[in-house]
Design a protein with these regions (language model features):
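Structural beta-alpha unit
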Residues: 1-3, 73-106, 126, 146-151
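Small/aliphatic-rich secondary-structure junction motif
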Residues: 2-51, 74-75, 80, 131
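Short, well-ordered secondary-structure micro-motifs
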Residues: 21, 48-51, 92-95, 118-119, ...
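Short, solvent-exposed amphipathic alpha-helices that sit
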Residues: 24, 57-70, 93
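Acidic, proline/glycine-rich short linear motifs
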Residues: 39-63, 83, 146-151
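Short secondary-structure boundary segments
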Residues: 40, 109-111, 140-141
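Glycine-rich, Arg-bearing micro-motifs that act as flexible, cationic patches
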Residues: 108-131, 145-148
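Short, flexible loop segments at boundaries between secondary-structure elements
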Residues: 134-146
Length: 151
């Protein structure tokens, strides 16, 4: 399958499934010679202004982006553009970043979780899936063994 995308965006959050998705994106971007962007969203509570100094969250974001840059290096991808954003909610921020930067493809990692007996994407991935205009690939983490019954 030939990848038509020239610009790929991967939202990251520091969780293992997010790192695996990013690693996969690095491999795809390297082979396709595509631009790769990573974004970490700091969700700022409504009680604070978006410009508030939330040093713990900023430090966490910097650590996550440093880890993402290390993964890109391990995967021999050069030219990663990684940054963090401040927003009220991650989903709308990722969609806006995708639109503003004219992304062709989003690769979104999601955890394996079941809610009410059904697999659930979670609110952020669901928002992105329903609102982004470019192509999207979901990378769900592997189910635990054995898979819980649906009873």
């Amino acid at each position: 399958m030939k990848l038509d995308a020239k610009r790929i965006l991967v939202p990251v959050n520091g969780k293992p499934y997010s790192e695996r998705s990013f690693r996969w994106a690095c491999q795809i971007a390297r082979e396709a010679k595509t631009e790769l962007h990573a974004v970490y969203v700091i969700e700022v509570p409504l009680a604070l202004s978006l410009e508030s100094e939330i040093s713990d969250d900023i430090n966490k974001g910097e650590e996550i982006l440093a880890r993402i840059e290390a993964i890109a290096s391990e995967e021999k991808y050069k030219g990663l553009q990684a940054r963090f954003l401040r927003a009220r909610q991650a989903g709308p921020a990722v969609v806006a970043e995708s639109e503003n930067k004219s992304m062709d493809l989003l690769i979104v990692g999601v955890p394996y979780k079941r809610q009410f007996g059904e697999c659930s994407l979670g609110s952020t991935a669901s928002y992105i899936f329903h609102n982004v205009s470019c192509q999207i690939m979901l990378s769900r983490e592997q189910a635990p063994s054995p898979i819980p019954s649906r009873e």
